[in-house]
């Protein structure tokens, strides 16, 4: 089981990586507790943990990329999409483990948003 920076590294300046490292530690502890309680330590037992954490990392990663994009401005985003204020607030305070597609679709109109990373598989380059 991987958690924190061992699972994925995210921008240290924005401090979101610290939050995700601590939160992933809590999440993995809950997943291990459930697996031990159920007597099932198979990989499938931990898929929910992995999917939730990957989704949270991707949400924060997109927000970090937008933050550093010189053409992006939170004020302009909220002027055009005031109904997304709650989604943006949730994302900024760490409520990352839900669907933020409408928010990031709107942000993509102002900033370049990265494609999702591949997590958990071997990262090899063909030589």
Please provide the spans of the model-predicted regions.
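Conserved mid-domain beta->alpha element of the FAD-binding
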Residues: 1-59
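C-terminal helical "tail/cap" subdomain of flavin- and related membrane-associated enzymes
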Residues: 33-127
């Amino acid at each position: 089981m991987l958690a924190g920076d061992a699972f994925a590294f995210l921008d240290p300046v924005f401090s979101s990586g610290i939050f995700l490292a601590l939160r992933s530690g809590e999440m993995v502890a809950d997943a291990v507790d459930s697996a031990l309680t159920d007597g099932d330590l198979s990989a499938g037992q931990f898929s929910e943990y992995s999917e939730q954490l990957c989704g949270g990392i991707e949400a924060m990663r997109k927000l970090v990329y937008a933050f550093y994009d010189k053409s992006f401005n939170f004020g302009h985003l909220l002027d055009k999409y005031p109904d997304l204020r709650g989604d943006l607030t949730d994302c900024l305070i760490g409520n990352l483990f839900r669907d933020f597609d409408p928010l990031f679709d709107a942000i993509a109109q102002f900033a370049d948003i990265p494609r999702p990373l591949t997590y958990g598989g071997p990262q090899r380059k063909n030589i």
